[in-house]
Amino acid sequence: MVALGIVAILILINSNRRYNKKAKEEKKDDKIFSEIVTTDDKERAWALLKGHVEGNIFSELEFVEGAYTDFLEGFINEDRRTLTKLYRTIRNEKEFFKTKRRKEITGLKKVDTVVAVQAGTWFHIATNNTSQLIYSLRRVLEPCKDHIDNNFNPLPQDCIEEIRPLAAKLTDLIEKEMNLVKTSVDLSAHLKEISAYKKEVSAAMERHINRMRSEQDSSNLNIYIIYQSILQETWQMADTLKHLARAVDKLKSL
């Protein structure tokens, strides 16, 4: 019980930090886009817009990293309050990102036409994949929240011991992706690491299918299906990171 309380407090602190960060980002956005709209210098407009796109993607990766960890720990600890609050937070984040993306699309009209055409494709691929990370969080959270709300069986210990190391590796990949956005990493090595991770998650899914086949207790069926969806969305998030990394690398080269 004490451990659950500590987890809830830590998640609440993280949530408040994210709220304060978003408030600061909104003020910064207004200033940046005001300059993009008013400047006649197309190179300046592109520099501002490119920096904003990279910053926006970085911010969302940071959000996804924290939210995924909060989700998993909230689910493992059957923390209904945390999952409910996180569900609202993810919904709001999705709308916040859509608003910033619409501004960025408008900003593309202010840069040189050739640059806009070159950047447009990679911009849309990058932002679409960033959106998919947020959607993955929502898809995996909703059934887990319903599961806890209905007081079904908790996640078995063997599943917890399996998913936690996989979750840690995913957040590590997200951090490396953030480094790719802000500075630079070896793209080829990063993509290979993601591919290796996807194989690891696929192996976990295969083991879990065998686990379900051998399970004698029918009361565990629902939690096993939920766990399979967690593994599937974890795999999907890694795959999305791979596509996002390629698009970000192309954008940074322009």
Label the predicted regions.
Residues 1-254:
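Cytosolic, long alpha-helical scaffolding segments
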